Amino acid sequence: MSDMTTIARPYAKAAFDFAVDKDQLDQWGQMLSFATEVTKNEQMNELLKGSVSADKLAEIFVAVCGEQVDAHGQNLIKVMAENGRLTALPDVCEQFFLLKKEHEKEIDVEVISASELSDEQLANIGSKLEVRLERKVKLNCSVDETLLGGVIIRAGDLVIDNSARGRLNRLSDALQS
């Protein structure tokens, strides 16, 4: 785990808890995403790494964000600037969205197949995974022809390797032991 993740987590948790309390998860997600884009601006990045005072930096940052960030979001920016943590804003945004997905019981699932899957196959995989994982599933599909056949499914810590290549590897391991 990176240092920035450790630094970002309390800010993300505070923003998340506030957003849940005020029923503003989507708005906070948009604000944090916008503020993250501002940090990626070359000139802003120079200011963040420079020797500008915290008050001045917060003032400039809030001015650049304009109406895209409400008073509560501006307060978060000011607190982060006072603590010299504005460079962690992209990580705060990332942590916020992880908390949001967990709250909404949603999970990203990577589906790698040997060939393009039909809509029916994807719907079938999605519905079975939703039952097994007890979450809303968002499928991210890709094709890897080296699998020979079948699919590999990755959802968090869960990996289901039902590819021909995976089966051959397991058979080879079993024969060698």
Swiss-Prot record:
Keywords from UniProt, A to Z, are: ATP synthesis, Cell inner membrane, Cell membrane, CF(1), Hydrogen ion transport, Ion transport, Membrane, Transport
PANTHER family annotated for this entry? ATP SYNTHASE DELTA CHAIN (PTHR11910)
Molecular function per GO: proton-transporting ATP synthase activity, rotational mechanism
Q: What is this protein called?
A: ATP synthase subunit delta 1
Q: Which organism is it from?
A: Vibrio campbellii (strain ATCC BAA-1116)
The region annotated as signal peptide is none
Could you say which protein family the record assigns here?
Belongs to the ATPase delta chain family.
Q: How does it assemble?
A: F-type ATPases have 2 components, F(1) - the catalytic core - and F(0) - the membrane proton channel. F(1) has five subunits: alpha(3), beta(3), gamma(1), delta(1), epsilon(1). F(0) has three main subunits: a(1), b(2) and c(10-14). The alpha and beta chains form an alternating ring which encloses part of the gamma chain. F(1) is attached to F(0) by a central stalk formed by the gamma and epsilon chains, while a peripheral stalk is formed by the delta and b chains.
Q: Tell me where on the tree of life, at the top rank, the source sits.
A: Bacteria
